[in-house]
UniProtKB/Swiss-Prot annotation:
Cell wall formation. Adds enolpyruvyl to UDP-N-acetylglucosamine. It comes from Jannaschia sp. (strain CCS1). Pathway: Cell wall biogenesis; peptidoglycan biosynthesis. UDP-N-acetyl-alpha-D-glucosamine binds at R94, D306, I328. Belongs to the EPSP synthase family. MurA subfamily. The gene is murA. Pfam families: EPSP_synthase. It is an enzyme of class 2 (transferase). InterPro entries: Enolpyruvate_Tfrase_dom, Enolpyruvate_Tfrase_sf, MurA_subfamily, RNA3'P_cycl/enolpyr_Trfase_a/b, UDP_GlcNAc_COvinyl_MurA. This is UDP-N-acetylglucosamine 1-carboxyvinyltransferase. GO terms for molecular function: UDP-N-acetylglucosamine 1-carboxyvinyltransferase activity. The keyword Transferase applies. Its EC number is 2.5.1.7. The modification 2-(S-cysteinyl)pyruvic acid O-phosphothioketal is found at C118. GO terms for biological process: cell division; cell wall organization; peptidoglycan biosynthetic process; regulation of cell shape; UDP-N-acetylgalactosamine biosynthetic process.
């Protein structure tokens, strides 16, 4: 099994190119099911999650062409041979559940396994189901599968919480439904807006994407399109935290402040300098110790839950005590015990973690528990004394393209080793 070894390496310097957004790309791939004409995606990140979803789409009859070393994918769903998304694939990747809306919208039926992915809480799919039921779908949960069927009609749907996955599943179903669907308390994430932009390019009639209220007018068919995947704001935010921990100056290429504004605000409050450039965002550590800053995760435009672990690693080196509140998922502080093994002072009570900065961390063998936890341990190792070995790094392959290469490119002492 692979592991990543990190040694404290001093200040970082250089540029890191940001890949296409994983979460956006996966939902765009599902949207290919809505049309019998090809959908071509560019700036595709080369990740194991993309490969897993490709496997699922191919099992449904989608043909996939791969160009530019996998950075361009062409999907042809002219003839779907199945409406069954099997457990063996869906269990590996939660985003696989988002074939439900497109399959139901196009074919009127779908059988989709309940999802898998990172082990970070229950992450129920209730909102997906109630939203589709409001549009007329008949849904039955049986033997771990969602059985859905029916001719969909426009409806007014208000989510109790702005769920990203539910908003996207309902939106994809609504573009092929009869009549108009109004989605209230919709997710405002850039990934959701990017999906709407792609659907519009395919001929969908959508208003209000990126706001709390979306209006989707159903159309008879969607045509093909070519669409570029936006920059990954979580990858970008991850690498922005690197100089906050190790010191130095790093420019993240390909994104904008608007994608990570909430993170920028907190990093500047901690004392880091952030400059928007023509190519991306530059983060500079001015020297000395950062100031402790409190964070509460929230739906976009709030602080992303997917950057909470990385920010915690940075606060381990800050002056004072920061309070991190996780409001999106339960059980998402699994990285805290591993940081404590490295000498961090962290007290977790329920959905709140109090992080008191320490003078230094010490390298130690640690275990990654999920995608974002794994990268937070690597970041912490950049400024720890000695050597940090992060085990179970297969999680990283789900969300970070060439992480070791990118960190080494700005001066980090990090390598990936295999037991063979």
């Amino acid at each position: 099994m692979d592991r990543i070894v990190v040694k404290g390496s001093g200040p970082l310097s250089g540029q890191i190119p940001i890949a296409g957004a994983k979460n956006t790309c996966l939902k765009l791939m599902c949207a290919a099911l809505l049309s019998d004409e090809p959908l071509t995606l560019t700036n595709v990140p080369r990740l194991s999650d993309v490969a897993t979803l490709s496997e699922l789409l191919e099992s449904l009859g989608v043909q996939i062409g791969r160009l530019d070393d996998g950075q361009t994918l062409a999907f042809s769903a002219n003839t779907l041979t199945s409406q069954l998304a099997h457990y063996d694939i869906v269990r590996k990747l939660r985003a696989s559940f988002n074939v439900l809306g497109p399959l139901l919208g196009r074919t009127g039926q779908a059988v989709v396994s309940l999802p898998g992915g990172c082990a970070i809480g229950a992450r129920a799919v209730d909102f997906h189901i109630t939203g589709l039921e409001a549009m007329g779908a008949k849904i039955e949960l049986k033997d771990g599968y969602v059985h859905a069927a029916g001719d969909l009609k426009g409806a007014e749907i208000e989510f109790p919480f702005p769920s990203v996955g539910a908003t996207e599943n309902v939106m994809c179903a609504a573009v092929r439904a009869k009549g108009t669907t109004v989605i209230k308390n919709a997710a405002r994430e850039p990934d959701t807006k990017a999906l709407a932009d792609c659907l519009i390019a395919m001929g969908a009639d959508i208003e209000g994407a990126g706001t709390e209220t979306m209006i989707v007018r159903g159309v008879d068919r969607l045509h093909g399109a070519t669409h570029r995947v936006i920059a990954d704001r979580i990858e970008m935010g991850t690498y922005m935290c690197a100089p906050g921990i190790a010191g130095g100056e790093v420019e993240c290429l390909g994104g904008t402040r608007a994608l990570v504004a909430s993170l920028c605000d907190k990093m500047e409050a901690a004392g880091l300098e952030i400059t928007e450039t023509d190519a991306g965002l530059k983060v500079r550590h001015p020297g000395g110790r950062l100031k402790a800053v409190d964070v509460a995760t929230a739906p976009f435009p709030g602080f992303p839950t997917d950057l909470q672990a990385q920010f915690m690693a940075m606060m381990c080196f800050a002056d004072g005590t920061s309070v991190l509140e996780e409001t999106i998922f339960e059980n998402r502080f699994m990285h805290a015990p591993e940081l404590i093994r490295m000498g961090a002072s962290i007290d977790v009570q329920g959905n709140t973690a109090r992080v008191t900065g320490v003078d230094r961390l010490r390298g130690a063998p640690v275990m990654a528990t999920d995608l974002r936890a794994s990268v937070s341990l690597i970041l912490a190792g950049l400024a720890a004394d000695g050597e940090t070995t992060v085990n179970r790094v297969y999680h990283l392959d789900r969300g970070y393209e060439h992480l070791v290469r990118k960190l080494r490119g700005v001066g980090a002492n990090v390598e990936r080793l295999s037991d063979g």
